C-alpha cells in the first residue's frame, strides 16, 4: 500500500482502492481521484472538500446525514462499528475531541469525533483523528494490531508530542506517522526529538513526511 501525507490530517491510501482520509488539503492537490473518502469528524479542517469530491464517504451518522443533503453518497456508521465498502474494511474507533458542522448560520452539532482502523490488501492503518491521549488506545492494539498509526502531535487542539509518545507505545504499531502539526501557528512543532526518543527507546519507527511525500507500508515494510 502506498501512503501519502497530503498535509494536516489528510492522507491518501493507494492499493486495490484509493482512499482519502480527512480531505482538507492545505498544500497541493490529490495525487489521484479517490474511490472512497473517510471523514473522522465535522470540523472544516477535516471535512474539507468531501462535498466537492462527492465520492462514497464513510463518516459518523450525523456527518453522513449532512453530506447526503449535499448529494454525497455517504455511508453512516458509529463508534465500535465496522463496515466494508468496495472490499475495504472500516472500523470506527473513539477519539477525545469535539465536532461541529459549520454551515449556514452558527453551525450545529456534528456527532462524535472518531478515528478509523482501515484495512485494505492485508494492511491495517489506524488514523486516530483529532484526539487527546486515552488509555483505551491499548485496546486498539489488542483488537486490531495496526501496521501503521497516524497520530496527531500538534498540541493545543489535540495531544502533543509527549502524549503522542505514550500513544505510540499503547498502540504498538511498528510505524508511526505524525500529523496535525505545522498547519497553523498554534500547532507548530519540532518533531526531531519525538522521533529520536521513540526510536531510541522502542522498536517503533517514526516517519516524518513532508506534504505530498509517499511511503510504501505493510506488515513487511513497517518494521524496516
Swiss-Prot record:
InterPro entries: Metallo-B-lactamas, RibonucZ/Hydroxyglut_hydro, UPF0173, UPF0173_UPF0282_UlaG_hydrolase. SMART domains: Lactamase_B. Keywords: Hydrolase. GO terms for molecular function: hydrolase activity. Signal peptide: none annotated. Belongs to the UPF0173 family. HAMAP family: UPF0173. This is UPF0173 metal-dependent hydrolase Memar_1421. The lineage of its organism: Archaea, Methanobacteriati, Methanobacteriota, Stenosarchaea group, Methanomicrobia.
